[in-house]
Amino acid sequence: MMLIPTHHFRDIERKPEYLQPEKCAPPPFPGPVGTMWFIRDGCGIACAIVTWFLVLYAEFVVLFVMLIPSRDYAYSIINGIVFNLLAFLALASHCRAMLTDPGAVPKGNATKEFIESLQLKPGQVVYKCPKCCSIKPDRAHHCSVCKRCIRKMDHHCPWVNNCVGENNQKYFVLFTMYIALISLHALIMVGFHFLHCFEEDWTKCSSFSPPTTVILLILLCFEALLFLIFTSVMFGTQVHSICTDETGIEQLKKEERRWAKKTKWMNMKAVFGHPFSLGWASPFATPDQGKADPYQYVV
């Protein structure tokens, strides 16, 4: 009877052709600290530009159609501050999600010398990606757009032109949250402005002509409703993924769980940082993810 090995082979293991030094070039020297990460993908760049354009369009309508023409100065100042603060945090989160290395595995380190340096014991295996010639840590997956293996890759999002992974998931969650909040805020203001225009003379409720005002408000309403639904679903999906400590790819592939199960609170702290603070809501605070080894090669 044929015995099934107790360990699971994924892309590689100990196959002679994969361990030849000439098959994998030595890994490149790491760039200087703070080097910006940016994916040169036409679709992703276009989606990122559209995202900024839509936020700036909402900013234009809120300020120049609804708030500045209003005679209620307290209403205009309070809503202007709130909306601009949320928009600023949303765009800052978008930049951090887009320009932060999501957790790329060093490229080209699957050399014979490096594998031998791991000093594998009998029964231990390492996974290799034949596409980028990297030794894959546990829970890493290859992204065909980024052309790299990404640690704890959840998915590749064209709207941030980047993968959502171990190092930038916090910023992606904040981006979806702040976009949902400014969308809700914009919808509420559009509703109040329509009521105000119906009660007052349409020529006095905006500095634009009535037809132009209606078109601008309807477009903003449609945009805000669409983004509110989309980002709310994405936010809920991401929070659920964090709490269960299971990425979107792992859920789709129904991969066998080989990592330790932790509480929901510990999983949240692993993404947003230790300990809990207002920095969780800030795209400028880099999370301290503790002392976990990000390169767990051997399983």
Curated annotation (Swiss-Prot):
Spans through the membrane: 48-68, 73-93, 172-192, 215-235
Compartmental location: Golgi apparatus membrane
Stretches in topological domain Lumenal: 69-72, 193-214
Domain DHHC stretches: 128-254
Catalyzed reaction equations: L-cysteinyl-[protein] + hexadecanoyl-CoA = S-hexadecanoyl-L-cysteinyl-[protein] + CoA; L-cysteinyl-[protein] + tetradecanoyl-CoA = S-tetradecanoyl-L-cysteinyl-[protein] + CoA; L-cysteinyl-[protein] + octadecanoyl-CoA = S-octadecanoyl-L-cysteinyl-[protein] + CoA
EC top class named in words: transferase
Main location per the UniProt record: Golgi
GO cellular component, one term: endoplasmic reticulum
InterPro entries the record matches: Palmitoyltrfase_DHHC (IPR001594), PFA4/ZDH16/20/ERF2-like (IPR039859)
Keywords: Acyltransferase, Golgi apparatus, Lipoprotein, Membrane, Palmitate, Phosphoprotein, Transferase, Transmembrane, Transmembrane helix
Modified residues (Phosphotyrosine): 18
Active site as annotated: 157 (s-palmitoyl cysteine intermediate)
Residue positions of covalent lipid attachment, annotated as S-palmitoyl cysteine: 146
EC number: 2.3.1.225, 2.3.1.-
Domain comment as written in the entry: The DHHC domain is required for palmitoyltransferase activity.
Family, as annotated: Belongs to the DHHC palmitoyltransferase family.
PANTHER family hit by this protein: PALMITOYLTRANSFERASE ZDHHC16
Biological function: Golgi-localized palmitoyltransferase that catalyzes the addition of palmitate onto various protein substrates. Has no stringent fatty acid selectivity and in addition to palmitate can also transfer onto target proteins myristate from tetradecanoyl-CoA and stearate from octadecanoyl-CoA. Plays an important role in G protein-coupled receptor signaling pathways involving GNAQ and potentially other heterotrimeric G proteins by regulating their dynamic association with the plasma membrane.
Protein name: Palmitoyltransferase ZDHHC3
